[in-house]
Amino acid sequence: MATGELKPRWGQPLTGIISFFVFFAIAWLLWFIFSDSRGPVGWFPYPFVMYLAMMILVGIWQHMLLGDWPFQNIEQPKRGIIMTIANLVLVWFVIDVIFYRILGLGFNFMNYYGLEAIEKPVVMAQVAVVCFVLIGFYTFPVSTIFFGKWPVQPSNLTQPAAGFAEIAWGSFWTLICYSVLIVPFFGSVFQGPALNSSWWVTLGGTSHVHWVFGWWEWAIVILFMTPNVWRMKPWSLITVPQPWKGIISVIISMVGAAALAILCKKIIPMWVPAETFQLLEEAKGASEVQRFFWLHSAEIAGFFLIPFLIWHHYFDDIALGLNRDGWAAFFLRTIGVCALAAGSYWIFYYGNFGHWALGNHHMTELSHRFAHGESLVWNFWWIIPLLWNEWFFHKWPFYIHEE
């Protein structure tokens, strides 16, 4: 097996450009097959969003926590193919067995078959899975990114024990956050004394779980921009030992996420047509407008995913001749990611990409596009070919090992 450093096969920026269009083409083709209303399957937005979300979370377990075990010594592309197949099998097992049939025994809102039996909307079980994944996108990788794998490392644990220990630690925090931030929403939907109802109504102006989406998605973006285009800045300025460094980083990231979500709420009316808000309020009241604000804040955050991931992994944090680890490059890439996210947002909504390219028939009128665009689904789907290539295929065939 080649052991030299990876280098872009065609140099930069050509390797980055080629990989960008390849990932886009793969995502677009598979979207047409599985999600586009004009395609053969038409799973939009559910259950498509549930499967794609769980694919990413299971991928985090496989790559970030288990270190590709037990396939780490298999050559490419065989390793990537095997890990992709394993991912799909695990996704089915986690959803259909762990959630629907095990956890669903105690929590009926997680039980697809239980909801079906009592003639309740089965989509709520799929929403419950998506919400778990949303929480897990932060609580599982945060131990690696902000805590340097504390408390599992440093230790003499090797794989798979180390990975399973990290999964257990992440699951502990995921279940706590899920109980506090997600379960009350289902208490509002399925009212009764067993589950508390949404406690954040006064804070967010809505009982909907989209209040959580609105700021939690920004926390995920901040978390993952850290090891990518930020190259661990600004957290590298925090010099206290673990776990204090991780705790401080989490607090700052959450405060920053809340601030960005509130900022989005304030500025969204600057470009979203007033008719959009009128239609929402006429349909379900003022709280529906607030729900939209929080959801659209999360959707705005979603447009940052592809820019910072591809800039780091396939453009090698290119910084126009600047020191890639310097502060000037940090600000250059941050501004660049913001600009690319804004451009992608404009193409999706004003260029109506969601309608003509993705088949969302709710986007024919401008006033309907923002409330029904479901851009977060596309942006998470778009990153899967990139993540699979980086995580499972280790950038094959776009990168080669130096001799």
Task: Label the model's feature ranges.
Residues 1-62, 132-134, 380:
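N-terminal signal-anchor module of multipass membrane proteins
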Residues 1-10, 58-82, 138-165, 191, ...:
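Cytoplasmic membrane-interface regions of multi-pass membrane proteins
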Residues 8-22, 75-93, 158-177, 242-260, ...:
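Transmembrane alpha-helical segments of multi-pass membrane proteins
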Residues 14, 20-28, 55-58, 88, ...:
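Long, compositionally biased low-complexity segments enriched in polar/charged residues
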Residues 26-30, 34, 61-66, 90-94, ...:
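Alpha-helical membrane-inserting segments
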Residues 30-52, 71-77, 97-131, 180-216, ...:
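Membrane-helix interface and helix-disruption motif detector
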Residues 47-62, 131-139, 214-227, 293-313, ...:
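Generic alpha-helical transmembrane segments
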Residues 207-212, 225-232, 248, 252-255, ...:
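Long, charge-rich C-terminal accessory regions
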